Amino acid sequence: MNNEKKYLLGLTLAELKQVAKDLGMPAFTGGQMAKWLYEQHVKSIDEMTNISKANRAKLAAEYEIGCAEFSDAQYSVDGTIKYLFPTRSGKFVETVYIPDKDRATLCVSSQVGCKMNCLFCQTGKQGFEGSLPAGDILNQIYSLPEVDKLTNIVFMGQGEPMDNLDNVLRATEILTADYGWAWSPKRITVSSVGVKNKLKRFLEESECHVAISMHDPIPSERAELMPAERGMGIEQVVELLKNYDFSHQRRLSFEYIVFKGVNDSMQHAKAIIKLVKGLDCRFNLIRFHQIPDIPLQGVNDEKMEQFRDYLTSHGVFTTIRASRGQDIYAACGLLSTSKKIGEIRHHEDEKLKEEM
């Protein structure tokens, strides 16, 4: 017999009302639960004080909040903080908090590891260990010490969001719904390499900003960097995007890590200009952060600026993204929980030996 409790964090308003109904409570109790969860961020059912003690006891007999504090934190000299959060499956994901003047962005993970296996990404080297339920995605925000300072959320951590689309859509629904965090979808950006069928569904069902990982405009070269090119090519991705309006509130951006001698030539810049012609978009150029045993190198600042200036002068709005958290391996492409989990388990084993 399974005596494990179910979780409230990650349930929609309709589902919370159904929980109340199933336990013999008035439907409005579901609305009360939503307020306690998504407005007050309570840690226990007993904190839901406008629900009767008897009903709280009924609820607690079958459910728990489902939140979990971070297991580890690393602090960068530039103010960036990398958190390690446990998941309900007993695994871990990394989440990066990036403060910057009047903004504070949280980079959340949607999977443990990743299937995409991009050549330049440490997460892909970890392998794929599972997709996060919406509750685990939301817990990275819910249990963040700086949650009240957040201005933006980006789904650019571990995993491919489109490969876990049901849970990403559920999480963004709760973040943007009136009963949830009530955030504008314009405060949320979801990234993707481009996953066949899934990207179209996301564009139809969500109003959040979109960031496409391009990294090379030439399909044969992109396939060498990103195996996902063989599933849905960058040309197919761009053709799909041309069916949607990005000229108003919703923003489309392309991510482009610049590699020395690989994708940094004028040929590549011209191919980008031709490829995105007619699209209202922006380009973010990203510095490559060295990964062990990967035969790729970054370019110097002068080369980055030349590439940016050429694109900008030909009508493609382009910026160079500031690298944050390099000293704690929190920058783009560096997230991986493998080593840190080993350290934590070793520490737990040592602690257990001391207690025996």
Where are these regions (language model features)?
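P-loop NTP-binding catalytic core
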Residues: 89-98, 102-103
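Generic beta-strand structural signal
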Residues: 81, 93, 104-108, 116, ...
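Auxiliary Fe-S-binding modules of radical SAM enzymes
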Residues: 1-93, 242-250, 258-356
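Ferredoxin-type iron-sulfur electron-transfer modules in oxidoreductases and energy-metabolism complexes
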Residues: 135, 139-147
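Conserved AdoMet/S-adenosylmethionine-binding subsite of the radical SAM
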Residues: 145-152, 157-321
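Canonical Radical SAM [4Fe-4S] cluster-binding loop centered on the CxxxCxxC motif
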Residues: 99-136
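Short linear Ser/Thr-Pro motifs
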Residues: 76, 109-110, 191, 213
